[in-house]
C-alpha cells in the first residue's frame, strides 16, 4: 500500500498526498488566504483537514510500527508540503481554518518533530493547536459542553503530545 501511495505522491510532485475531491483547487484557495470554514466544512469540501490527518496518521504509524523508511520519507514530504501551504497565512487565518474538523493534526506534527528531530514540525504542531479549545483548558475552564467530543478529543491528545 505504501508503495502505491508513494506513486501518487511522486506524481503530485510537491509532496501532496490526499484524496479530497478537487483538493488542489481547495488547497490553492487556502494558500491564498481564501478560507471558508465551518464545523465540518472547509472551502465547500467535507472535512478535508480530517481527511488529510488520516493520511498523516497512517504514514506516521507505518513509520513507527514497521520502520518503513519509505513511509517516513513520504510523511516528511507531506509535512513539508503543509508548511509551504500555510507559510503566508496569519495565525488568525490558521485558527479560522481549524474551526473545521481537523482530527489530531497537532499530534501528528508533534510526532513528525519527534521522529525527525526537526523543530519546524513542532512549530507546525503549535500552529495547528486549536486555541478556542486550548486556552480555556489552560485556565482550567470547562468550555466543552455542547461540543462534539469526537472532534475535541484528538485536539486534546495533540496538546498532550506537544507537551511531552
Per-range role (PLM):
Residues 1-164:
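Glycan-recognition and catalytic cores of secretory/periplasmic carbohydrate-active enzymes
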Amino acid at each position: 500500500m505504501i508503495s502505491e501511495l508513494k506513486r501518487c505522491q511522486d506524481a503530485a510532485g510537491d509532496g501532496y498526498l490526499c484524496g479530497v475531491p478537487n483538493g488542489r483547487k481547495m488547497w490553492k484557495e487556502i494558500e491564498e488566504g481564501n478560507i471558508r470554514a465551518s464545523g465540518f466544512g472547509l472551502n465547500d469540501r467535507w472535512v478535508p483537514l480530517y481527511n488529510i490527518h488520516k493520511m498523516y496518521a497512517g504514514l506516521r504509524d507505518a513509520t513507527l510500527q514497521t520502520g518503513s523508511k519509505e513511509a517516513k520519507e513520504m510523511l516528511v514530504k507531506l509535512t513539508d508540503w503543509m508548511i509551504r501551504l500555510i507559510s503566508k497565512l496569519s495565525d488568525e487565518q490558521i485558527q479560522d481554518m481549524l474551526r473545521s474538523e481537523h482530527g489530531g493534526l497537532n499530534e501528528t506534527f508533534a510526532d513528525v518533530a519527534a521522529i525527525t528531530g526537526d523543530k519546524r514540525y513542532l512549530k507546525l504542531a503549535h500552529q495547528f493547536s486549536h486555541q478556542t479549545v486550548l486556552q480555556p483548558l489552560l485556565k482550567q475552564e470547562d468550555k466543552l459542553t455542547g461540543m462534539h467530543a469526537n472532534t475535541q478529543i484528538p485536539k486534546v491528545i495533540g496538546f498532550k503530545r506537544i507537551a511531552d
